[in-house]
Amino acid sequence: MELDVESTSITQLRSHCETCFPLMEEVVPRRERYVDLLEFSNFNGIPYPVVDPSRKPRRFLADFRYSWSIPLIHHYPNVEKDVLSSKRVHRVISKLKEQNDEQKNRAVQFFTEISARLSKFICKCCSYVLYKVFRRLMDKLLVCKEEMEVLYEAEQTGIPMVYLPLHRSHLDYLLITWCNWHFGLKLPHIASGDNLNLSGLGWLLRATGAFFIRRRVDPDDERGKDQLYRAILHSYIEQVLSKDMPIEFFLEGTRSRFGKALTPKNGLISNVVEAVQHGFIKDCYLVPVSYTYDAVVEGIFLHELMGIPKVRESVLGVFRGIFSGFSKSKQCGVVRMHYGRPIRLTEYLATITASLSSNHRTRPVRMTKLSTSFSYRELVPWHRTHSETVDDRTMIRAIGFHVVYEAQMMCSISPVAVVSCLLLAKWRGKVSRSTFERDCEWLCEKIIAEGGDVVGYQSKKTKGSALVKYAFEKLESCVEVTDEYVSPKESHSSFITLAYNKNSVICRFSIKSVIALTIVSRPSGTKLSIDQIVEDALSLCDWLQFEFMFCRPCDSLRELVHNVLGQKEWSDPIHGFLRSEIEDDGFLDAGGALNSGTLRVRDAKSRETLQFFANLVRPFVQSLYLISSFVVSEKCPTEPTSDNNIIRQLCQQSLAGDIDLPFAPLLESINSDSFKNALRVLKDKGLLQRSTPNSTARSGNSRLAELISNLERVLEVK
């Protein structure tokens, strides 16, 4: 059967964290089928195209008629007077040395630089143009109408909405606004980097809701210029929310260059939290949003992943990008939008404060060294301090991590990602097509069992051949396909492309992957201590904390690792991956957490499956090894050198084979994104000096030698 991309394996809308935000007595809406926004104009929007399949579409001037007939009923007041007269801005002006008149003029300039100027007429025109753009770029643009109904109900409460999408493509800026217009929701004010405020185009973005923020501020700030700028920006966000207008910004701060969620930044979310804490607004809804693309319109960021600096946006570059994107029809394939359940910020503040406070005493002291592992006991990236109270910075980090985790976990998986995952983690060479198709079905079932959803896949119904056929059309540049065999093309760009797609799958199996890697790094048949597996898995999580979000702030990572080992798939007495040394005594009761004892891998088939899971994260551990070994070698400069130059040099030398390694590196492990995160974690743990910002020099730290030795142990396949 062909892929039914509008179907879904998830039949109920739910909050992924029902520990923090239980639904209580609410009736959970059922999710029906996704609807295609590109079809709305053909049916005049109402009823939805899926309601009456017998109705034939009316294509004559459909987009034009629909765009002008759907009203923009909401009001978007100008907040300039409110911002410039706010207490926050006046307080900053009164502190500065220059005359008040000069500072007031500067404040007006900053407001003009930042503010959106939303125009209903321009939005109407753009809504029509975007129909043409999206039809060219996409096969379908799918949303869940039940999710939109939940958003509509939340908006009717009068509490402002804050949309927090993951960031994959520049198209992300357009999708929420366009989707909200279809469903009669308010159009958001969208935080955009000032790099997009281009001559001749900035006004158009402002007219559709964009407000621009500086990507960098002056760290010296002798004249208080940036202090005033921050006050204007902060007050602008407060005033927009106080007028019940929604805001949209990307917690990650920038587009993901490698296909996975980034750790959140604290900037704009801290302004929203402060506005609620200080009572400027009573509350707001936080709405996680994510997107599933078969391919992003910009393509893979290959040059940036090789350490080549990003070219700053320009008007000419925009037109080049448009021409490149339009040169191939349906480049993005099927695109899905996912909206999480709106949660009030006050609920986040209450539940996360309670969770972090109650769990604090059970967390081990940071940097408690293990004798046989190569890191530390717990991953607490949102909890850097050890005071008895939860400070504001910790709270803001926790909220950011919680929202991004929710967004990544509700994201559907593209068939392109499923195929890419198998090509890299299981079959890196030639494999028969029939075997590969069966494995596609197997992996889709695993994703569904983990609570995920694969676009177009219906459990026990969809054939792997349909998935493979669909995905290969999008991967023709990096996969060799015949009627009998499948294999990836042997080039760095091909493996990077496949890795970009594969990385969206890892969040479903991240904890399983690190556990599997600790197991397969030991010789076959070796007795495995459960305590040691857990400690080594936590160590790997710690070292990969800037690559993946393994759990929510309210979760205990240690408990989750134990729970995975206790799952039926792992501990079933007959079919589990692991066999207890005392199974005959009734030790294993599949489904409960395992806390002690010794285990063995059951058989060769179980080890093969564990090897697949381990290979999901192996490239990232290899990247950490490559960076660690490079910064202690003679190839690394002795004087502080910019991180970008270090990374670019390492990429070039690794691909040229100029670096001696005890293993053959996976080509996808050679990329700037993973190297940056590796440098970041080495500096975070004090293994590299931070004397010069964004720079690295050769290190003689003895702890690096210990790390390298232990990484070699983990990366060795036995």
From Swiss-Prot:
<dbReference type="Pfam" id="PF19277">
    <property type="entry name" value="GPAT_C"/>
</dbReference>
<dbReference type="InterPro" id="IPR028354">
    <property type="entry name" value="GPAT_PlsB"/>
</dbReference>
<feature type="transmembrane region" description="Helical">
    <location>
        <begin position="409"/>
        <end position="425"/>
    </location>
</feature>
<dbReference type="InterPro" id="IPR041728">
    <property type="entry name" value="GPAT/DHAPAT_LPLAT"/>
</dbReference>
<keyword id="KW-0594">Phospholipid biosynthesis</keyword>
<keyword id="KW-1133">Transmembrane helix</keyword>
<dbReference type="GO" id="GO:0031966">
    <property type="term" value="C:mitochondrial membrane"/>
</dbReference>
<keyword id="KW-0472">Membrane</keyword>
<keyword id="KW-1208">Phospholipid metabolism</keyword>
<dbReference type="GO" id="GO:0004366">
    <property type="term" value="F:glycerol-3-phosphate O-acyltransferase activity"/>
</dbReference>
<keyword id="KW-0443">Lipid metabolism</keyword>
<keyword id="KW-0012">Acyltransferase</keyword>
<protein>
    <recommendedName>
        <fullName>Probable glycerol-3-phosphate acyltransferase, mitochondrial</fullName>
        <ecNumber>2.3.1.15</ecNumber>
    </recommendedName>
</protein>
<dbReference type="GO" id="GO:0019432">
    <property type="term" value="P:triglyceride biosynthetic process"/>
</dbReference>
<dbReference type="Pfam" id="PF01553">
    <property type="entry name" value="Acyltransferase"/>
</dbReference>
<keyword id="KW-0496">Mitochondrion</keyword>
<dbReference type="GO" id="GO:0006650">
    <property type="term" value="P:glycerophospholipid metabolic process"/>
</dbReference>
<dbReference type="GO" id="GO:0005886">
    <property type="term" value="C:plasma membrane"/>
</dbReference>
<dbReference type="GO" id="GO:0005739">
    <property type="term" value="C:mitochondrion"/>
</dbReference>
<keyword id="KW-0812">Transmembrane</keyword>
<comment type="pathway">
    <text>Phospholipid metabolism; CDP-diacylglycerol biosynthesis; CDP-diacylglycerol from sn-glycerol 3-phosphate: step 1/3.</text>
</comment>
<keyword id="KW-0444">Lipid biosynthesis</keyword>
<dbReference type="GO" id="GO:0016024">
    <property type="term" value="P:CDP-diacylglycerol biosynthetic process"/>
</dbReference>
<dbReference type="InterPro" id="IPR002123">
    <property type="entry name" value="Plipid/glycerol_acylTrfase"/>
</dbReference>
<dbReference type="InterPro" id="IPR022284">
    <property type="entry name" value="GPAT/DHAPAT"/>
</dbReference>
<keyword id="KW-0808">Transferase</keyword>
<dbReference type="InterPro" id="IPR045520">
    <property type="entry name" value="GPAT/DHAPAT_C"/>
</dbReference>
<feature type="short sequence motif" description="HXXXXD motif">
    <location>
        <begin position="167"/>
        <end position="172"/>
    </location>
</feature>
<comment type="similarity">
    <text>Belongs to the GPAT/DAPAT family.</text>
</comment>
<keyword id="KW-0809">Transit peptide</keyword>
